[in-house]
């Protein structure tokens, strides 16, 4: 056992001497000065960086960078000058020509032509997209509205479901005889609150309006209002309007955009134009004419085509100009 321990000790001592000799031979390859400073090299680099003079920045360059403004993404787009003549072919670069503006009759003709060339449904819908100027002045705006109109030419054979609010038994009978889907008083209110009754439009007689307050939040813009002709005593007349009525409504998210279907593409062009004019006339009632054009842009499109920009000057109602004689008559009447 002692012999084995002595043998192991000799091996370890020999190995230690061999390692020390190898390290000494490697260290002798470098000068003494390098060997002494090699392990402190990072301190020398830090000292050199501290003593190095700071880079001088020209005053003009500094002012230039401070005056620079961020370039807008729109300015990065290369602008092209428009061509003087109209495109000679149907295929052309849009950026080289201003957007074309069409009369209503020409736009309808093109939509019918697109349908034939594209082999699409001839009975597809025709839509009118309006961008509105909702400003009233002095930080006031037009509230998003909903209206009901009777189009000159119907494009749908479906009859709207109409509910009539009245507590009078004879009026309930009249409503049912004239095509009302539902008619009643507080019992009808409860059914609507429980979602048992859902219809397209709601009309009411003035006497029952106080009992309809629970429905105000539920019906929202379809709640009966005098401005929408949904409150009155002539029940047959209201039903005649709302059974075939067309509803137009401003988009609640965009606040100034209105899109509505006005016809089908297989209808005669004059009927499509008449429906378009009826919608614009109704829209323009929601803002005084003396504030300028209410419709900023109008596009006509079909279900499968692009929108065609319309000339709106001839479509918008004009403010009535009063003559001097009419003004004098008005002032005289007011004084009397």
Swiss-Prot record:
The keyword Mitochondrion applies. GO terms for cellular component: mitochondrial inner membrane; mitochondrial large ribosomal subunit; mitochondrion. It holds the Pfam family Ribosomal_L1. Keywords: Mitochondrion, Phosphoprotein, Ribonucleoprotein, Ribosomal protein, Transit peptide. The modification Phosphoserine is found at residue 85. Coiled coil: none annotated. GO terms for molecular function: RNA binding; structural constituent of ribosome. Residues 1-50 form a transit peptide. InterPro entries: Ribosomal_uL1-like, Ribosomal_uL1/biogenesis, Ribosomal_uL1_3-a/b-sand, Ribosomal_uL1_mit. Its main location: mitochondrion. SUPFAM superfamilies: Ribosomal protein L1. It is found in: Mitochondrion. One of its GO terms (biological process) is mitochondrial translation. Belongs to the universal ribosomal protein uL1 family. This is Large ribosomal subunit protein uL1m.
């Amino acid at each position: 056992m002692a012999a084995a321990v002595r043998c192991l000790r000799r091996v370890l001592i020999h190995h230690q001497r061999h390692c020390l000799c190898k390290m000494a031979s490697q260290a002798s390859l470098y000068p003494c000065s390098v060997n002494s400073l090699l392990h402190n090299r990072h301190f020398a680099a830090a000292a050199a960086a501290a003593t190095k003079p700071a880079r001088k920045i020209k005053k003009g360059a500094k002012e230039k960078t401070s005056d620079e403004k961020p370039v807008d993404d729109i300015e990065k787009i290369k602008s092209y000058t428009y061509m003087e003549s109209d495109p000679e072919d149907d295929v052309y670069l849009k950026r080289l020509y201003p957007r074309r503006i069409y009369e209503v009759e020409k736009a309808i003709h093109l939509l019918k032509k697109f349908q034939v060339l594209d082999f699409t449904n001839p009975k597809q819908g025709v839509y009118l997209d309006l961008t509105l100027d909702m400003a009233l002045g002095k930080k006031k705006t037009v509230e998003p509205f909903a209206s009901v109109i009777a189009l000159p030419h119907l494009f749908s054979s479906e009859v709207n479901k109409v509910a009539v609010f009245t507590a009078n038994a004879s009026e309930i009978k009249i409503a049912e005889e004239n095509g009302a889907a539902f008619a009643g008083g507080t019992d009808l209110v409860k059914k609507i609150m429980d979602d048992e009754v859902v219809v397209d439009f709601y009309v009411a007689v003035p006497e029952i309006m106080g009992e309809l307050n629970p429905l105000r939040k539920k019906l929202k813009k379809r709640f009966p209002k005098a401005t929408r002709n949904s409150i009155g005593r002539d029940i047959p007349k209201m039903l005649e309007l709302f059974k075939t009525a067309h509803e137009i409504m401003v988009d609640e998210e965009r606040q100034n955009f209105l899109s509505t279907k006005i016809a089908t593409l297989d209808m005669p062009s004059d009927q499509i134009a008449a429906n378009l004019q009826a919608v614009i006339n109704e829209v323009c009632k929601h803002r005084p004419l003396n504030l300028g054009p209410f419709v900023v842009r109008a596009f006509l499109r079909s279900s499968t085509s692009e929108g065609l920009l319309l000339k709106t000057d001839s479509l918008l109602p004009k403010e009535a100009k009063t003559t001097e004689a009419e003004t004098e008559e008005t002032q005289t009447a007011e004084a009397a």
